Amino acid sequence: WCDHGHMGICADVLLLDEPTNHLDMDAIAWLEEFLINFENTVIVVSHDRYFLNKVCTQIADIDYAKIQLYAGNYDFWYESSQLMIKQMKEANKKKEEKIKELQEFIQRFSANASKSKQATSRKRALEKIELDDIKPSSRKYPYIDFRPKREIGNEVLTVSHISKTVEGEKLLDDVSFTVGHDDKIAFVGPNTKATTMLFKILAGEEKPDEGSFKWGVTTSQGYFPKDNTKEFDNDLIIVDWLTQYSEEKDATYVRGFLGRMLFAGDDGVKKVKVLSGGEKVRCMLSKLMIMAPNCLILDEPTNHLDMESITALNNGLIKFPGVILFSSQDHQFVQTTANRIIELTNTGLIDKQTTYDEYLANDELARKRQIMNMDVDGED
């Protein structure tokens, strides 16, 4: 996707399967504009709600064993489909009440000669009533609810002059910031390697070359790494894998957390090393729920998740009463979760108490971002 200029010349239809995967926010924004201005047909599969809202004029909903087409974007589809189900359920409820009323009349008066005609008429009316067939949805939403064991105090995290170089590349250069007890901080921008390294340092998996950091005495941390390979490089089954992170060792208790993440029945005896990418992410989220920390460090937690799981995670983080440091390339996820934005640029740190949309819309910050993200070695 680096050289797209030729794409629109001869393509009548673009078929795009998860085109935003592995793209950063700037590349996704470029792709959105390209597709909006593309004059021919685009058929796209994506789990990025903001992207679908920006690009799509129609939504094909594959559910209930059929395809239903909706005119409008993702939000319109969601509201319309939920309204349709609600209306069908309400209509069925009214029909069921009518059926009960007719059945009671027939039962009372079918043997009564003076009421027999009325009873016969109601039998005919009863035969004409048909309930709408509401098939169970193929969509399953996990239940994600992070409940800290301990309330967080005012002193959360102080990062002081941290620097880190890896294989000759300076990833972090004199990084300093303080985290408050109400902060939900999104780390954004193209320098994702720097964010990952910072999170590893704060989680105790790496050491800084210079500088230091200090967690408050009331804090407990839960870390979700971008690469979870080593977490599952063992022969444990899912239940045993999760039990090692739980103070309560009762199998029924542990299975309850797996059930929240849609693991059922024999899923619990699967070996973790054979799980899919999405299943491993759901296991990691189960781990965070069962550990119950009051500070979450989440590096690209929506990777490998389906739309329903992303929505559930999004809602769970919005409700979370603790501190969150996270990164994500999902615009809506960042916009609805974060109340503070930090960008680690090539030449320093931008830190703003704001939403992501406000951050992007700020012209002064946009100029600052452009200057600070220039490659200082190859600057024109």
Please annotate each region the language model reported.
Residues 83-174:
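Flexible nucleotide-interacting loop at or near the entrance of a catalytic core
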